[in-house]
Amino acid sequence: MSNKVQRFIEAERELSQLKHWLKTTHKISIEEFVVLFKVYEAEKISGKELRDTLHFEMLWDTSKIDVIIRKIYKKELISKLRSETDERQVFYFYSTSQKKLLDKITKEIEVLSVTN
């Protein structure tokens, strides 16, 4: 088998194990984690920038992105703030406790062992 095909298969195995771990350990989907991590990387990000980034990087429909954002907001995993100058503009960020949770999850992922 070619190296590239083998790498894709290995990546899929690792991704499948990560999805299972996120679901069983933290009750979040991989899609929710991707959105959470994009906010984590930016620290504070506008809704438009978040949607655009996910749409172009992950090739997700904006309606899917909106559903995921609503779900993680309802789970209180992110916070949002409306712009004082333009009420239509929303920014997503983490409270101290939310950031601690994401710190914990990302550290756990770094040491997560993948089985062959």
UniProtKB/Swiss-Prot annotation:
Query: Sorted alphabetically, which SUPFAM superfamilies does this protein's record hold?
Result: Winged helix' DNA-binding domain
Top-level taxon: Bacteria
Q: Which Gene3D superfamilies match?
A: Winged helix-like DNA-binding domain superfamily/Winged helix DNA-binding domain
- Annotated signal sequence is none
According to its UniProt record, what is one Pfam family this protein matches? Staph_reg_Sar_Rot
Q: Recite the UniProt keywords alphabetically.
A: Activator, Cytoplasm, DNA-binding, Transcription, Transcription regulation, Virulence
InterPro entries attached to this UniProt entry: SarA/Rot_dom, Transc_reg_Sar_Rot_HTH, WH-like_DNA-bd_sf, WH_DNA-bd_sf
DNA-binding positions are 51-74
The text of the family note is: Belongs to the SarA family.
Q: Does the keyword DNA-binding apply?
A: yes
This protein's major location comes to cytoplasm
Report the gene name. sarV
Which protein are we looking at?
HTH-type transcriptional regulator SarV
Induction field: Repressed by SarA and MgrA by binding to the sarV promoter region.
